[in-house]
């Protein structure tokens, strides 16, 4: 499963919107300056996710980064 597919699955399972996640990621790690357009690119697979962005996503969703290692 790709990073984008994993993110889509997590968002669906948890009932969270991209807007909610972007806002939460910026609260947790303001230095990443995530915006909706960039996150949408990640979710659709058109853009790669940096390590910091991945960590912020995991913290926002309260999950372990290990879910992306499968």
Where are these regions (language model features)?
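A short, Lys/Arg-rich alpha-helix, primarily the initiator
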Residues: 1-24
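Short alpha-helical "recognition helix" segments of helix-turn-helix
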Residues: 21-28, 57
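Helix-turn-helix DNA-binding elements, focusing on the entry/boundary residues of the two helices
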Residues: 18, 36, 51-54
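Flexible coil/turn residues that form the inter-helical turn or adjacent wing/linker of helix-turn-helix
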Residues: 3, 14, 32, 47-50
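Recognition helix of helix-turn-helix/homeodomain-like DNA-binding domains
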Residues: 29-48
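Conserved hydrophobic/aromatic packing and binding residues within compact polymer-binding modules
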Residues: 7, 21, 39-42, 68
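DNA major-groove recognition helix of helix-turn-helix/homeodomain DNA-binding modules
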Residues: 50-67
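DNA major-groove recognition helix of helix-turn-helix
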Residues: 25, 43, 53, 69
């Amino acid at each position: 499963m790709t990073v984008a597919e994993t993110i889509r699955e997590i968002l669906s399972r948890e009932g969270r919107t991209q807007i909610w996640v972007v806002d939460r990621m910026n609260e947790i790690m303001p230095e990443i300056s995530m915006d909706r357009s960039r996150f949408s690119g990640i979710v659709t697979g058109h853009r790669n996710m940096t390590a910091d962005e991945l960590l912020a996503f995991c913290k926002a969703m309260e999950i372990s980064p290990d879910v992306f290692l499968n």
